[in-house]
Amino acid sequence: MTGKTVTRADLAESVFRKVGLSRTESAELVETVIDEICNAIVRGETVKLSSFATFQVRDKNERIGRNPKTGEEVPISPRRVMTFKASNVLKTRILKSHVARKIKLKPLNPAP
């Protein structure tokens, strides 16, 4: 794993280089897309980006949890959570990248 985090600025820079919009327009485009996705999720809508992933809001019922330090039972309030489910296309790309990286990192003369 590279450990790199891709930021909004990185996405805007990529749009700038690949699409040809100005840097300002690229940043505005990225912000608009992110805002639209966030607004849809907040409204409880499912956001499906083909070949990428599905974002969905789920309701979780109240349940009993346990304090790990004391073992005491504690009620956990009902809440809404967002889930992210990667598409099969994305999962395949990740797997291929992982396999390619493993092959590339494999030592040429393994020790017995």
Curated annotation (Swiss-Prot):
Cellular component annotations (GO), alphabetically ordered: cytosol
Sequence similarity: Belongs to the bacterial histone-like protein family.
UniProt xrefs under InterPro entries: Hist_DNA-bd, Histone-like_DNA-bd_CS, IHF-like_DNA-bd_dom_sf, IHF_alpha
Protein name: Integration host factor subunit alpha
Record keywords, A-Z: DNA recombination, DNA-binding, Transcription, Transcription regulation, Translation regulation
Top-rank lineage group of the source organism: Bacteria
Single GO term (MF): structural constituent of chromatin
Cited Pfam families: Bac_DNA_binding
Record-level GO BP terms: DNA recombination; positive regulation of metabolic process; regulation of DNA-templated transcription; regulation of translation
Function: This protein is one of the two subunits of integration host factor, a specific DNA-binding protein that functions in genetic recombination as well as in transcriptional and translational control.
Xref: NCBIfam families: himA, PRK00285.1
Quaternary structure and partners: Heterodimer of an alpha and a beta chain.
